[in-house]
Amino acid sequence: RWDVIRWSEIANEIFKVKSEGRRVKNEERRMKNTRQVIHGISMGAATTMAVSGEKTPDYVKCFVEDCGYTSVWDEFSAQLKDQFGLPAFPLMNTTSALCQYRYGWSFAEAQQIEQVRKSTKPMLFIHGDKDAFVPYAMLHPLYEAKTKGRKAIFIAKGSVHAMAYRDHHEEYTRIVKDFVSKEE
């Protein structure tokens, strides 16, 4: 009886791997003619920039980041100061150490600016000039860090955090469409 149970577990693993391999090949065939834009706002922008520095499939054509931050350290430090009037030291150091202990990564490792620096595919940077949550001042270092591949910038005049699309709907849409269409 144990032999049969064990064989069913082994067979499951064997056939799962084969069917997974088949699924991956089918997915690759399907994606061959796909063009993908990775576009994120706020935390999504941080994720977009984090992905931008990695090797991505050929169907990923470009990136659009809207109000992303330079690094977790910079963003959390800004929030401590602006929302609570607290200095970065010692809270950031302590919290980063706890994060390292508990989750295996420190704030120093989460640097979107370093990923942007490695990025080779085109990227559009968008930020509202009245953004205080992710300070507008973070936009230009990110833009300057992008030295490989095409880049463009859109500053949404008068927009606060994550409101560039709402405040400048037509202009935002046109700029994103124009940027993305150059990758077709």
What are these regions (language model features)?
Residues Q112, K121, P135-E144:
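Short alpha-helix in the alpha/beta-hydrolase fold that links the catalytic acid
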